[in-house]
Amino acid sequence: MLKVVEAFSGIGSQVEALKNIKIDYEVSATVDWEISAIYTYDILHNGKQNLKDYRLHHKESIVDKLTTYNLSSNGKDPITRRAMMAMPTVQLKSLLAAIERTNNLIDITSVNADQLPNDIDVLTYSFPCQDLSVSSFWHNNFSGITKGVGNKSGLLWEIERLLKDFSNKNKPFPKFLLMENVSAILSRHHIDNFNLWKKFLEDLGYYNQVYTLNSNKFNVAQDRQRTFMISVLCETPIIESNVDHYFSLNNLENVDLLKTKNISDYLRLDYDNNQYLHEAILATPNFTESRKKIMENNRILAVDRLANEHLNAATLTTKQDRNPNSGIIKFEKEVIKIGSQYRNLTPRECFLLMGFKENDFDTIIENDLEVLSGKKFLSNARLYKLTGNSIVVPVLEEIFKQINQINTEILKPTVSILQ
């Protein structure tokens, strides 16, 4: 069994990957402060909530509990008590239930070694990319993962703090660390800081394997390049040699899985299906001059009900009604909204392009909360953001296969794979 701790857990793409490849696992703790991610993670991986244990709580008592956590509704700023009091009681109860069911420690800046088990196999950390991304460059933000600047991407160094706490308390380090972020982390602006991070891990005894992987090589119709680092704790030189040899023979950058899926497997173009039609209408913007440019400048993934099967979606980001976006569906004969000439990808299609299953999305929608009359907690804007911030599941599947193989064949046995 792999015992996993997910820092910056999002909606749990790591757990989804482990489920898919049928590796026995246990999530000891998660860490995320954004409330829609917390709730979605819980519903996706633990199923429908039963709030009967919270039936005697009133709003004030629930808020008293929730305000002890550092929660956020936008991933940027903490929620105030006043804002919490404005939320429906059922939403507050559901949020508290989600925190407790996922053992969410919420605030990475306050997590310490005492809160985590002694036998962690894998600690994952997909820290925020805002200060590393290309968009930050265009806004003259070069702070990246510079230590001590107090930005979002700098939360990487909270993992350093946590590992130092492990050391100070003579607590065993996790066997594996798994990092994911944008590939700009390897750019000339950020490579020195990244090398500083790698050196810290090496000094603790970790062997670092860095991969830059594109999801289009993993049978996913999305062009999404991300950088991963698997860090393996090597307690002896022979183990380190064996791990190095393993990665030299099994480099995932050389993988190009047989393509059995194309964009038509992800698009929902059957508008005779009322649910697909409803979602498509919500993803169809009013046609304006700026949206004319969106239509002209972005990939046309389908025309009416016919997909362009040779195309992949561009990288999914946290918004679709923008330029550039991940691709559009153009209307020539199809009319789902008067005056419209195209639509964006729907949240369902985005979830599928990140490697989640359709019934995963249906589970989320079926368990969504009504926060106001006719207004759901998981709005389309929130769903787009959740998927844009996630990790492509089939890529993680191949990474976890490697972690599991190293764990069972190199770290646990004493027999060298070189023999």
What are these regions (language model features)?
Residues 53-61, 244, 409-419:
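Short, flexible loop/turn segments with low-complexity composition
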